[in-house]
Amino acid sequence: MSKKYDKLGNDVFNKVEKINSELFTLTYGALVTQLIKDYEDIEQVNIKLEQMGYNIGIRLIEEFLAKSGIGRCSDFIETAEVIAKVGFKMFLGVNAHVGDWDANRKEFHLTIEDNPLIDFVELPDQYKHKLYYSNILCGVMRGALEMVQMKVKCTFVKCTLSDDSTSEIKVVLEEVLSDMIPVGYD
């Protein structure tokens, strides 16, 4: 299954329109810097980045589904592989790796070896292990998965900007949402 999604991720990445990665990275850095100035409390910056990502994710899922041609995943394991091999490749140009599944297959860790959001970035010591610079990614995944009926909680557990060897996000499936149409919307 993983090889299939590796190929699909590469195929979709080669077809989508791209922007200059340095411009993207520097623009994101300016956004984070402005949030730090606006909020002063680093935890509020983390929350705001996650909320911004959520708003992006609920819209990005439509583009993802349209351009990738992927239908409904059979289970959470397949969903994790699609996120790692197709989603991250399509939108960030990198692959992520899925691992550390719990016994119930409701929780996994997503490892990003080469996070493009942190190029050219060095965190001051007072922000290490406090500011989750790429927290927008957690929000994007939460928003996108909610649109396909999965309520998840995403949290950064490791960040290379805080001297960890990799960037790692913990994803927990909290609930599969009902896809019943609300009364009066038929």
Swiss-Prot record:
It comes from Dictyostelium discoideum (Social amoeba). GO terms for cellular component: cis-Golgi network membrane; cytosol; endoplasmic reticulum; TRAPP complex. The keyword Transmembrane helix does not apply. This is Trafficking protein particle complex subunit 3. Belongs to the TRAPP small subunits family. BET3 subfamily. The lineage of its organism: Eukaryota, Amoebozoa, Evosea, Eumycetozoa, Dictyostelia. Pfam families: TRAPP. Disulfide bonds: none annotated. InterPro entries: Bet3, NO_sig/Golgi_transp_ligand-bd, TRAPP_component.
